[in-house]
């Protein structure tokens, strides 16, 4: 032929390892058919176009019998190229990789099958470059999609595994909590009833012991200190009785001290001259021996001060506590007839209103407790009140021992 025509090599060059003779014979077979078709109908510009199947533009139904037989003879050679590609790809696969990620095995096999079905390289001098580029672009896009799918599958597998582990842990924690709660609340009705009866028995025993203690406490006090048989009355009466016992202790101490002072006083009276009057002798005996005072300012009491004063003599021991216009007076002395009435009258003459009176006696000793309120506008001190009470008992003692009367109205505060 005068004119050399180079047709694209569509088959036999995908791996680049086939013989030159086989490729040349295939090229000759297709070139002869293309030349005949081009001379008859096809224009010069459409000679290099590709069919959708990857072969030349000549359809298979227009090929003669000899061409078909030649194509069938070279089919086995073309198959060798595919098996070689398959062997090359299979040798590069690591089986351990499939053991680690079994989900990816199917996708890799699908990828290999797509590569076997499609030609890897299609080159020609004019039209082969276009077909090769299209095939390479398609394969690259396919590989990118497969890689993305593989990565997504791996990520989904890892995420799914972590979520499963978390769900399993949450399930186990819930089971443990449910077991603990069941263990705490798993009480039968018999156990609940037994616990309730135990509480009732303990409370009953406590009340029984409390009532027993109150009964013993009530038996130790006189009946006058307990007006009612309830718990508050018994405890209140016991407190009052203890206070009275403290006052009685003071009375006994004062009586003992008076006896000592009385003996010394008798010795002093025997040595006095006969010219001395009885009034003078009584006045000397009634002179106070101990006078003490104390002033305490109360915190938060609105500026009020609590004053305490004591005035002790052989006739009486006087203790006064003054807070504002309220005072508490305690007098410990020997029992004398008419002494209480005279004392109350003298206190009223001193403008002291008596609010409460308590009397405790033991043999010949008596303890007077007065709660009084100062009604006069004159401000008195605790020491003034104690000194005035000592004068009152001096006159009472003198009036008792000496026939005659004593004018109590002349007693004033010194």
Swiss-Prot record:
Role: Transcription activator. Together with MYB88 and MYB124, ensures that stomata contain just two guard cells (GCs) by enforcing a single symmetric precursor cell division before stomatal maturity. Together with SPCH and MUTE, regulates the stomata formation. Required to promote differentiation and morphogenesis of stomatal guard cells and to halt proliferative divisions in their immediate precursors. Mediates the formation of stomata. Prevents histone H3K27me3 marks and derepresses stem cell gene expression.
Species: Arabidopsis thaliana (Mouse-ear cress)
Motif mapping: LxCxE motif: 249-253
Residue segments, region Disordered: 1-61, 142-197
Name of the protein in question: Transcription factor FAMA
Oligomeric and partner information: Interacts with FAMA through its LxCxE motif. Self-interacts. Also interacts with bHLH071 and bHLH093. Interacts with RBR1.
Listed PROSITE patterns: BHLH (PS50888)
Coiled-coil regions, chain positions: none
GO biological process, one term: guard cell differentiation
GO MF terms held by the record: DNA binding; DNA-binding transcription factor activity; protein dimerization activity
Keywords linked to the UniProt accession: Activator, Developmental protein, DNA-binding, Nucleus, Transcription, Transcription regulation
Other notes: Plants overexpressing FAMA exhibit ectopic stomata.
Comp. bias regions, Low complexity: 12-24, 35-49
GO CC aspect terms: nucleus
């Amino acid at each position: 032929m005068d004119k050399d025509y180079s047709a694209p090599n569509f088959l036999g060059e995908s791996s680049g390892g086939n013989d030159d003779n086989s490729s040349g014979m295939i090229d000759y077979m297709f070139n002869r058919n293309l030349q005949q078709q081009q001379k008859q109908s096809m224009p010069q510009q459409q000679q290099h176009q590709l069919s959708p199947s990857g072969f030349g533009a000549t359809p298979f139904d227009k090929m003669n019998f000899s061409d078909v037989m030649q194509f069938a003879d070279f089919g086995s050679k073309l198959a060798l190229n595919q098996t070689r590609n398959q062997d090359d790809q299979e040798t590069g696969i690591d089986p351990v990789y499939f053991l680690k990620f079994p989900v990816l095995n199917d996708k890799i096999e699908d990828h290999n099958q797509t590569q076997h079905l499609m030609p890897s390289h299609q080159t020609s001098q004019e039209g082969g470059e276009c077909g090769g580029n299209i095939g390479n672009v398609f394969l690259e896009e396919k590989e990118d999609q497969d890689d993305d799918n593989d990565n997504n599958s791996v990520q989904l597998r890892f995420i799914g595994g972590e979520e499963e582990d978390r769900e399993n842990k949450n399930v186990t924690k819930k089971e443990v909590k449910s077991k603990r709660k069941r263990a705490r609340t798993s009480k039968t009705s018999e156990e609940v009833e037994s616990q309730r009866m135990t509480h009732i028995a303990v409370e009953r025993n406590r009340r029984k012991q409390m009532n027993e203690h109150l009964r013993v406490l009530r038996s130790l006090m006189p009946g006058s200190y307990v007006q009612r048989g309830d718990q508050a009355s018994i405890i209140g009466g016991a407190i009052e009785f203890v206070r009275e016992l403290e006052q009685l202790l003071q009375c006994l101490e004062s009586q003992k001290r008076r006896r000592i002072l009385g003996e010394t006083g008798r010795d002093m009276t025997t040595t006095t001259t006969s010219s001395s009057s009885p009034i003078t002798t009584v006045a000397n005996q009634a002179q106070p021996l101990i006078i003490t005072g104390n002033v305490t300012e109360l915190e938060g009491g609105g500026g009020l001060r609590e004053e305490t004063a004591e005035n002790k003599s052989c006739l009486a021991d006087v203790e006064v506590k003054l807070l504002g216009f309220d005072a508490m007076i305690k007098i410990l002395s020997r029992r004398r007839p008419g002494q209480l009435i005279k004392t109350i009258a003298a206190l009223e003459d001193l403008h002291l209103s008596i609010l409460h009176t308590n009397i405790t006696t033991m043999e010949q000793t008596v303890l007077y407790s007065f709660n009084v309120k100062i009604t006069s506008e004159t401000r008195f001190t605790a020491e003034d009140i104690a000194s005035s009470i000592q004068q009152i008992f001096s006159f009472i003692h003198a009036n008792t021992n000496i026939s005659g009367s004593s004018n109590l109205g002349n007693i004033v505060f010194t």
